[in-house]
Amino acid sequence: MEDYILKVEELNYNYSDGTHALKGINMNIKRGEVTAILGGNGVGKSTLFQNFNGILKPSSGRILFDNKPIDYSRKGIMKLRESIGIVFQDPDNQLFSASVYQDVSFGAVNMKLSEDEIRKRVDNALKRTSIEHLKNKPTHCLSFGQKKRVAIAGVLVMEPKVLILDEPTAGLDPMGVSEIMKLLVEMQKELGITIIIATHDIDIVPLYCDNVFVMKEGRVILQGNPKEVFAEKEVIRKVNLRLPRIGHLMEILKEKDGFVFDELDLTIGQARKTINSWKNKIFND
């Protein structure tokens, strides 16, 4: 039996101006895995995330966290936000304290933990995100990538079960993208945290994500593992997305250059293995 940490049932959300942002969303998020939410701008990804941790309340339908409907009382929402943390796309919207230590400790202080526990959690969060050396640095002196790590540490300090990140790789150079994604996967594997990301960086999805949901106009139109989702090439392109670059290359080799592949590979490692297998078969024949 599958273990789902979040279950979304017929979720609808309407903004006060009448915008119907989410339309009958049904979604199950597996515990302890990395899930990607894909879709163009304005499809409802951020609205969905804000429903996940109680910033917004569904117009209809419901969300279950740990198999229990979300409790929208003040106490229930405070508890929920300790368990489901959000890291926004722009860390400047999340950092507001004078120093890194003050900012990272904010959530733990609000939980009314003891000073010793706060210090312990902050030190652990700083170590986990590899920013111990920035502990006393003013937040306004940080690079964009450093600010991203501080924002993640500020959520980690509350020891959440779910970490939601809106465009975690936006604004980062290639090395920064690789480092931040490896950090997230490390936390998922070592701490058992469920990671949910919204991203336009298609190439990271087959490398780091276990499950994928594709949204269009407030609805989920595709779901599955990366190979299952990107196999639906026409649907992917109709919603203004694309295949991962390696997947596109393998598609071209098959359709235009006579290569014979059983399935669409999406990563360099997968493609190398398939091409070597094809090459060996040709030479042996």
Swiss-Prot record:
InterPro entries: AAA+_ATPase, ABC_transporter-like_ATP-bd, ABC_transporter-like_CS, ABC_transpr_CbiO/EcfA_su, Co_trans_ATP-bd, ECF_ABC_transporter_ATP-bd, P-loop_NTPase. Its EC number is 7.-.-.-. The keyword Ribonucleoprotein does not apply. Keywords: ATP-binding, Cell membrane, Membrane, Nucleotide-binding, Translocase, Transport. Its main location: membrane. It is found in: Cell membrane. Residues 6-242 form the ABC transporter domain. It comes from the Bacteria. PROSITE patterns: ABC_TRANSPORTER_1 (PS00211), ABC_TRANSPORTER_2 (PS50893). One of its GO terms (cellular component) is ATP-binding cassette (ABC) transporter complex. GO terms for biological process: cobalt ion transport. It is an enzyme of class 7 (translocase). One of its GO terms (molecular function) is ATP binding. ATP binds at residues 39-46. PANTHER family: ENERGY-COUPLING FACTOR TRANSPORTER ATP-BINDING PROTEIN ECFA1 (PTHR43553:SF24), HEAVY METAL TRANSPORTER (PTHR43553). Belongs to the ABC transporter superfamily. This is Putative ABC transporter ATP-binding protein CPE0195. It comes from Clostridium perfringens (strain 13 / Type A).
